[in-house]
């Protein structure tokens, strides 16, 4: 789920969204983790370069990595100089609707984007994440317009993101994009619940069961996943 081949995954701190199903709540704030320079992270990555083969590489996830775009640009500049495949796992929530020179630079250094679309409907997106979905959808169009490959990822939660109508509206939106290489439907799981307990935070989906197999297959069919 982190991109093609064998991946070295870097988890970044900081995220403006509060997704109800988030399994990494420990990455929401900037106070966790360890401070590293781009050079230090690149040096660690290079130790494993021989394992990447032709398809593997580095995926930067989070949190929301685009909150630290300057770091990403510096890290990917180093990695591309070593011919390492680069990938960003993002919600697109930080994308400035008017575009940015920094984003143009990042796109030139990034081979693939994993774009996590939370919900196609505006009100439902706010209820699910606490944020509007204008920026994520604009970012998807931005990537498509610039011919940048992307994989779409969609978390399926019973009663929250599995409505057939919403899935069909999302499919209609995806059909307007030219560079979607793959759609992944990720069934909800509760493995992150223990992290909320450690953070003394309430887990609002406590008791929510994973979606049934037929609902997963239904979502895959509607969204064109697995093609």
Question: What do these predicted ranges mean?
Answer:
Residues 225-227:
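Radical SAM enzyme core and accessory elements
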Residues 42, 46-50, 54-57, 62, ...:
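Conserved AdoMet/S-adenosylmethionine-binding subsite of the radical SAM
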Residues 26-30, 126-132, 200-208:
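Short glycine-enriched, charge-decorated loop/helix-capping segments at active-site entrances
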Residues 35, 130-133, 210-213:
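Short, conserved loop/turn and helix-capping segments at secondary-structure boundaries
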Residues 38, 42, 167, 171, ...:
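Short, amphipathic alpha-helical "lid/cap" segments that border enzyme active or binding sites
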Residues 1-36:
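Canonical Radical SAM [4Fe-4S] cluster-binding loop centered on the CxxxCxxC motif
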Residues 181, 197-222:
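A structural motif corresponding to the C-terminal lobe/cap of the Radical SAM core domain
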